[in-house]
């Protein structure tokens, strides 16, 4: 695969650190050269007349804000998914986006880009924050042309799979506490924080519980999902395969936000079960975990079960620095703090054991 981007004017040739986005087609052989038009965000692109875009490379120069809960990602990632189809509809030649991350390194961030329903799309690349700054500065002085050269191939779907393991409950094995993480990662790094750390956290927590003298009353089930990064296929497959068991799933949760320390406990319980949420938080408090809102997301790989009515919780991790590494060559073991990882395991083991060994239900009582 070739994924190259060069500034070729005014009067210079400067390589940029770039990565072709997932789903991007190839450029024509030898690449394409076009003038760049900059937009500060997707709203500006959507409002632009077609005449401002036709034949040009659209550059979305939106910065991502740093936040403990990662809230800036939901805003910034929109350009990665929507630049290509919107720019294509306006007649653009290609898309460039400022990397969806909070770092200032010369690393491009990888990730998926949407394709039009008929399968056509535009070449789309992410460029590093440093290169985005240079390009923006040059555009402030006048016209800039860029050459993009991508060779990419969209292959047929291949077989993936999930790994499922259980600690059978000693009294009510049909009742399930579901723990999830995903096995796949993007190609640029090691996948240590996305999501090797999640796999390690839930596996280590389950092992601690398994090694106790007495198993909990309910079954603890681990789902290590495949094919999350290209569409949450593993989690969706689990939902289809276990839909008939949804009523027996007591609660579900996923670790898929790196290895920053768990700082908040969020729930999505029925109003009648909120006293249980407060009891869990008190148990987690010695680990530095604060109470959170009753608005938990649960995680992508348990979303199918959530849609079937399964209560979810979030052991919310500190994501202040997560997007410095996310989907980049910097996603390595170096980015993981051992003390934070141990605190995650302790928090997961605490919640999961209590949820699996108690009699509580987090759903609304059945109507009589």
Locate the predicted segments by residue.
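Noncatalytic luminal/extracellular "stalk/propeptide" segments of secretory-pathway proteins
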Residues: 1-57, 61-69
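Acidic/His- and Gly-rich active-site-bordering loop/insert found
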Residues: 1-3, 128, 159-184
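Protein/peptide-recognition domains central to ubiquitin and immune signaling
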Residues: 1-16, 97-116, 160
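Metal-dependent peptidase/peptidase-like ectodomains
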Residues: 13-14, 34, 122-127, 132-133, ...
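Alpha-helical metal-binding/catalytic segments enriched in His/Glu/Asp
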Residues: 79-80, 84-87, 163, 175, ...
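Loop-rich non-cytosolic ectodomains and luminal regions
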Residues: 52, 84, 88-93, 97-144, ...
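His/Asp/Glu-rich mid-to-C-terminal helical/loop segments that flank catalytic regions of hydrolases
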Residues: 207, 211, 218, 323-368
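Structural recognition of the beta-strand scaffold that forms the well-ordered cores
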Residues: 38, 57-61, 93-98, 124-126, ...
């Amino acid at each position: 695969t070739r994924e190259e981007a060069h500034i070729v004017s005014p009067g210079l040739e400067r390589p940029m650190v770039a990565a072709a986005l997932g789903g991007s087609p190839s450029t024509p052989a030898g690449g394409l050269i076009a003038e760049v038009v900059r937009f500060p965000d997707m709203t500006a692109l959507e409002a632009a007349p077609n005449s401002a875009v036709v034949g040009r490379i659209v550059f979305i120069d939106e910065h991502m804000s740093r936040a403990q809960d990662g809230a800036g990602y939901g805003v910034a990632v929109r350009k990665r998914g929507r630049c290509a189809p919107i720019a294509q509809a306006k007649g653009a030649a290609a898309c460039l986006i400022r990397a969806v991350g909070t770092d200032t390194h010369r690393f491009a961030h990888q990730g998926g880009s949407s394709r039009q329903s008929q399968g056509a799309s535009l070449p789309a690349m992410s460029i590093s924050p440093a290169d985005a700054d240079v390009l923006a500065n040059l555009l402030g002085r006048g016209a800039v042309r860029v050459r993009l050269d991508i060779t990419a191939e969209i292959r047929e779907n291949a077989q993936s799979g999930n790994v499922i393991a259980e600690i059978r409950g000693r009294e009510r094995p049909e009742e399930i506490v579901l723990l999830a993480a995903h096995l796949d990662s993007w190609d640029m790094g090691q996948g240590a924080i996305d999501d090797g750390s999640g796999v390690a956290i839930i596996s280590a927590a389950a092992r601690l519980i398994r090694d106790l003298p007495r198993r909990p009353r309910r079954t603890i089930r681990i789902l290590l999902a495949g094919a999350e990064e290209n569409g949450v296929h593993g989690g969706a497959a689990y939902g289809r395969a276990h839909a008939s068991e949804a009523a027996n799933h007591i609660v579900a949760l996923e670790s898929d936000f790196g290895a920053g320390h768990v700082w908040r406990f969020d729930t999505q319980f029925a109003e009648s079960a909120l006293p249980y949420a407060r009891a869990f938080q008190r148990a987690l408090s010695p680990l530095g975990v604060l109470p959170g809102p009753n608005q938990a997301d649960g995680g992508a790989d348990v979303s199918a079960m959530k849609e079937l009515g399964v209560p979810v919780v979030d052991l919310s991790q500190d994501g202040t620095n997560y997007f410095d590494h996310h989907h980049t060559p910097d996603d390595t073991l170096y980015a993981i703090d051992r003390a934070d990882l141990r605190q995650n395991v302790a928090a997961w083991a605490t919640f999961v054991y209590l949820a699996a060994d108690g009699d509580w239900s987090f759903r609304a009582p059945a109507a009589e």
